[in-house]
Amino acid sequence: MTNVSIIVLDFGSQYTQLIARRLREDKIYCEILPYHTKVADIKAKNPQGIILSGGPSSVYNKDAYEVDQGVYKMDIPVLGICYGMQRIAADFGGSVVRASHHEYGKAELKILNLETNPSPLFKDCDDERIVWMSHSDKVDTLPAGFEPIAVSSNSPYAAIANEEKRIYAMQYHPEVQHSEEGYLMLRNFARNICGVTEKWKMEHFLKEQIKNIRAKVGSGKVLCGLSGGVDSSVVAAMLYEAIGDQLVPVFVDNGLLRKGEREQVEEVFKINLKVPLVVVDARENFLSKLAGVSDPEKKRKIIGHTFIEEFEKEAKKHDGIKFLAQGTLYPDVIESISVNGPSEVIKSHHNVGGLPDWMDFELIEPLRELFKDEVRKIGLELGLPESMINRHPFPGPGLAIRIMGDVNEADLTLLREADVILLDELKASGYYAKTWQAFVVLLNVKSVGVMGDNRTYDNTVCVRVVEAVDGMTATFAHLPHDLLERISRRIINEVDGINRVVYDISSKPPATIEWE
């Protein structure tokens, strides 16, 4: 188990994961725990500091979220952010009230006494900075022993401190990108105030995980479903490094992959990494079950159930399998233990979560402590090619949810050819690496066109390219018009059956990234 330098107690803020990510970017290992975690459980992790996150509650409400008061007696620094600041103020005898002017968005922060007696929280910061506010309550009176260390135009207590007790608090969100030098303030808290010196490195994590896998697996075998995506590829490569041929990696070709995808996976794992990849050709089974099905939820469920069916058939061929490997990431773990429990299901998940009862395997989740960007670094350490590690996310149901309506081989071929043109042009122009996800959607809408002297009545496709940090929110990519024109021209000229290309300029929310 990795030593925990900082613990973040989560009060339900949408930004809580960003706190952990910002610290980890500075090679500071931290974990997120629910706000109601008992102090004994916190002490067991031996942290050097604690951060209280923001949250939607109000401290003066009857059912307000409260922290174990023993946290303040652990003799380690504490930092409160937004609700965390209000929680600290209330817990130490100050007052918190509903603000007459709510603050949402950018605000100008003025740091006090920066030249004469600066707080260590603001070491190397400029005296005036733009920060991100998101609150409707405010600290009205400070508790004894606390002093203001920063103000904003709407708040005389934008940041406060009790230097003697090493307790600090901010009304704004330093973890959000809009907060200038926010990362520096978080670093100052961890490095200068908490005294964190250790640097968390991916190569150390990898060595530790390989040792743990070997100890856990012993002489048993591990079954691993490989999709060709980043997470499952890194899991498979890590397991093979740890246990060699005790790994049974299974790649199911469902007929819904992009052009050349199966061949790429086979080349990387069979040829480059020498992994004994088991390839199951299940294209006919998937497509026959999807025939005539147009409802997106039904398509997802059919694909999920059929995958389990194929996985089950292959698993029965191998004796001695005791473990099942999954590419669970840290955001999945956080959500499962979050303040409010798992989020409402917007779309059915396609992963292996519904395996049959007879598969009584013990789970191995070697990536469960990592965020996506950290998984990519592990992949590079393991020798996976950058083209695979830095690829855009691809949904488990594949191209089936990029075809509006029922799925058939002719439409899949059409979509593959259009999709590869889009990706080729984005890579050639340098925009592939600058965007989060890019794909073509076959709308199954026909329109009239003219090609040469002939009238056409062919398919319309939609190009979708988005920018995002983690996929939770996204904005459409503002691609140059000449690039969009080139993509459109090539698709229409090179893919028989398409005569019109449109560009999706919707953001998430309200739209989702995928169309289905």
UniProtKB/Swiss-Prot annotation:
Endpoints of the signal sequence: none
Keywords: ATP-binding, Glutamine amidotransferase, GMP biosynthesis, Ligase, Nucleotide-binding, Purine biosynthesis
Positions annotated as active site in the UniProt record: 82 (nucleophile), 173, 175
Domain annotation Glutamine amidotransferase type-1: ranges: 5-199
Catalysis performed (reactions): XMP + L-glutamine + ATP + H2O = GMP + L-glutamate + AMP + diphosphate + 2 H(+)
Gene Ontology CC annotations of this record: cytosol
PROSITE patterns registered for this protein in UniProt: GATASE_TYPE_1, GMPS_ATP_PPASE
Annotated CDD domains: GATase1_GMP_Synthase (cd01742), GMP_synthase_C (cd01997)
Binding site for ATP: 227-233
Pathway: Purine metabolism; GMP biosynthesis; GMP from XMP (L-Gln route): step 1/1
Ligase keyword on record: yes
EC number: 6.3.5.2
Pfam family, any one: NAD_synthase
Domain GMPS ATP-PPase: 200-391
A molecular function GO annotation: GMP synthase activity
Subunit structure: Homodimer.
Role noted for this protein: Catalyzes the synthesis of GMP from XMP.
Name of protein: GMP synthase [glutamine-hydrolyzing]
Organism of provenance: Sulfurimonas denitrificans (strain ATCC 33889 / DSM 1251) (Thiomicrospira denitrificans (strain ATCC 33889 / DSM 1251))
Gene behind this protein: guaA
